[in-house]
Amino acid sequence: MRNVKGGVWKNTEDEILKVAIMKYGLNQWARISSLLTRKSPAQCKARWHEWLDPSIKKTEWSKEEEEKLLHLAKIFPSQWKTIAPLVGRTASQCLERYNRLLDEVQRQQDNENGGGSGGGGTTTTTTTTTGENDPRRLRMGDIDPTPETKPAKPDPIDMDEDEKETLSEAKARLSNTQGKKEKRKFREKQLEEARRLAFLQKKRELKAAGINYNPKKKGKEKSWDISKEIPFYLKPKAGFYDVPDEELRDEPNKDASFIGKRVDQIENPNYLQRQEKLNKLEDIKKSKKEIFNLPQLISETSKSNDVEHSIKRTKLQLPEPQLTDDDIQEISDYEKLNGSGSGGGSGGVGVGEFPLPAPRTASISSTAANNNTNNIRTPMKQDTIMSEAQNLLALSNAQTPLKGGAGPNVSQTPLPKSVNNSTPFRTPNPLANQTPTQHNKKQSLNDSNEFAIEDKFKRQQGKNQLLSNLKNLPSPTIEYKLELPSELPTIEDDTTLELDNSEIHIREQQQLKHKEQFKLRNRSTVLKRNLPRSRNLFPINKNNNNNNNNNINQDELRILKEINRIISHDNKTFPNDSITPSSTFDDDDDDDNHHHHHDDIDNNSINDNDEKYENYDYFTNTELEFADKLIRDEIEQIKQELKQPLPSSNEILEEIDQIRSQFIYLPKENQFIEKSNANQTQLIENLQFEYDKTLNKIKNSSMKSVNLEKKLNIYNGGYQNRSNTIIKNIDDMFDQLEQSEIEYQCFVALKNNESIQMEKRLKSIENQVYDQCEIESRLQQKYAQLLNEKNLLKKKLSIF
C-alpha cells in the first residue's frame, strides 16, 4: 500500500521534529523528514515556520494589528508573505484573519438586506462566526488544507504499531553517537591529541638538550609587539606645572566606586538602617508597655478598634449652587404670577404683581431657549476596521474597469497610527490656506458700490426668510416648571447599607474582640496583678441583717457582700479547674506553685451562692479612680490619726505568719479553726492533709524534674557527646605525652651512656691506630731490607 504523506500533526511528531531541528538545524529538512514517515520535507519546514517556532505570536489580534493588516492588504493584494513580517504574524494567520473580517462584513450586510436587527448598534471585530454558520468549519469527510497551522493532536493511550516503530526509530537515530560521522570525528580528535602530545614530547626533549624551541617567536625578534609597546615612543619629561585634574580624568579606575552600586546605596545609604532601628525601638516600647502597663495598652488597642472611632464614609461634597434659595423663590413666584400659558413673555403684569428684574428675566429666557435646543453630544467614533473591511469587500466584488461605468462606493478612512506615513514632513505654507484677497480697485472693471448693495439685499432677504420660518414653528407640547421640593431627602445612614459576608464576619470578629477586652478591663485587681485568688466565699452571718443599730456591722456586711460578688464574678468569667484546697493561708515555700495553690476554689460552695450574687455592677474608669482616691485619702487620714509611721513590710509579714501559725485547715469541714480549739481528731485530720499535700508536691516535683531532665538531655545531648569525645581525646593525648616523656628520658640516659663509652672507644681506636702504624713502619723497613737483598742478588747473578 502506498504511504500518503500529510494529514494532521500529532504530538509525538511535533516532539520528534523539535529534537531533530535541535540536532540537524534549519537547513537539512530532508534528513529531518526521514525521521517522520508520514511527513515530507516541505511539510516539516512549514510546520516549524507556521506553528512550532517560538517567535510565532499566537495571542489575540489587537485593533492596531487589524488596522495594519487591512491597510497592507489594500497596498499589497494577495502578497501574504510580504505582509506577514510587517504585521508580526505568519502568512496563514494573516490570510485567516483577513477572510474572517470579510466574512463578518458580509454577514452584517446580509442581515441588513434581510431586515435583520443590528441597525442601531455597531459590532466589534472581536465577534467571529462560529458554529454551523462558519463557512470554514470542517464537515464530516473534509480534509484540512493547512494542517501545519493547527494545534497538534494529543497522543492516544494505546498507540498504533506504526507510531511506536516510528518513535523508537527516531529515538535510536537521534541518540546515535556511534555512526560513521561520529567515528570520523572521534578519530580526528584522537589524531589531534596525539599530534599535540608528540609536539610536547619533542619540545621537552629539546629543552632537556639545552635548546629552547618556540616556533611562535621564530622570525619576530626584531619586530615590535604593538599590543605591548609603542614603536619609537619617548616618555615625556616632567613639566613645571602639576596636572592632577588631567591625571584624574584619564584614570581608568576613576568610576570603580560607582560601578556595581545600587540606587539606595548612592542616594540614601543609611535609610534602611534608620528604618530598621526605628522598628526595633517601636517593638521595644510595645514590649515594655505590655510588661509594665498592660491595662493602658489594652485600653489604647480597644479605643483604636472601637466601632465608634472607626472611619465613617464621608458625605458627598457637592459644589456651591449657582442659584441661591432667594433666586429659586423669585423664579417660582414669577411662574405662579404669569401662569402656565403665558409663554414666558415679558408683558402683561396684573394688579398687585411685581415685575422680575430685567437681567434675571433675560437669563431665564435664555435658559428656556437653550432648553428647547438639542443637547450637544459627543460624536460617535467610526469603526475604522469594519469600514476598511467593507471597502476591501467592495473592491474585491467590483467588476473589471475595462467594462467602464462607475466604480465601487468606497468610504474614506483615516490612516491607522500603526502604519508609518510615507509622505515626508514639510514646512507649512501659511499663504496657501488664506482666502484670496480682493483685486485692486484700479484693476477692477466694475464699481464696488454695486456689489455692496447686492450683498446687503441678500442679507436682508435671508433674515426675512429666517423670521418667517420661525413663525411657522409649532407650539411647544412640553412645558417645564421649577418647583422646590416640600421635604429634603434624608441621607441614608451607613447602617442601612447591605453588607456582604466578609464585612459581617469582620464586624463579628471586632465585636468578639471588644467583648473580650471588656471582660479583661472589668476583671478584679487580683486577677490583673496575678495575685492569689480566694478559695471560697466569705461566710456572712444572717443575724447582722437585723442589727440596724450597728453601722459598723452593716458596713462590713456590705463590703463582704461586694467581695463575694466580685469573687463569684471572677470565678464564673475566668474559671480555674485545678482546685486543691490548702491548709494554710499561703505557700511561700514553693515559689513555682505560689499562684496555683492560691487559685484553688471550692466549686460547690461557689455554685450554691451564684444565685445570690448574679447582679454584678460594672463601673467606669472615672468611678474606679474616684473610689481609689477615697481609699488613699482614708489611708492618709489614718496615718495622721496614728501619729506614728506605719509598720514595715517585714513586720507585717512576721505578724501575718504569726497569725497563720495559730490556725489549721480542716478539709472535711472546708474551713480554718484555731489550733488551740482543735481536738485530737482534727489535728490528725490536718496532719493527714498536710502529708497528702506534701506527697503530691513531691510527686509533681519529681515529674517536673524528670521532664526537665529529658529536655536537658535533648538540648545538651550533643554537647555532652562532644564533651565526652573531647575528654577521651584529652586522655589519649595525655597518655601519648606520658609515653613521649618516658621515651625522652630513655634517650637522654642513652645519650649520657653513649658519651661516656665514646671516649673509651676513641682511646681504644687511637691505640689500635698507633699499633697499626708501628706495624706498618716495621714492615716497611723489612720490605726495604728485603728489596736491597734482592738487588744485591740480582747484581751477583749478573756478574756470573
From Swiss-Prot:
One BP term from GO: mRNA splicing, via spliceosome
GO cellular component terms listed in the entry, alphabetical order: cytoplasm; nucleus; Prp19 complex; spliceosomal complex
Record's subcellular location: Nucleus; Cytoplasm
Ranges annotated as biased composition (Gly residues): 113-122, 340-351
Major place of residence: nucleus
Composition skew (Polar residues), residue ranges: 409-445, 573-584
Membrane-spanning segments: none
HTH myb-type domain residues: 1-56, 57-106
Subunit: Component of the precatalytic, catalytic and postcatalytic spliceosome complexes.
Protein name, UniProt field: Cell division cycle 5-like protein
Protein's organism: Dictyostelium discoideum
Lineage, broadest ranks: Eukaryota, Amoebozoa, Evosea, Eumycetozoa, Dictyostelia
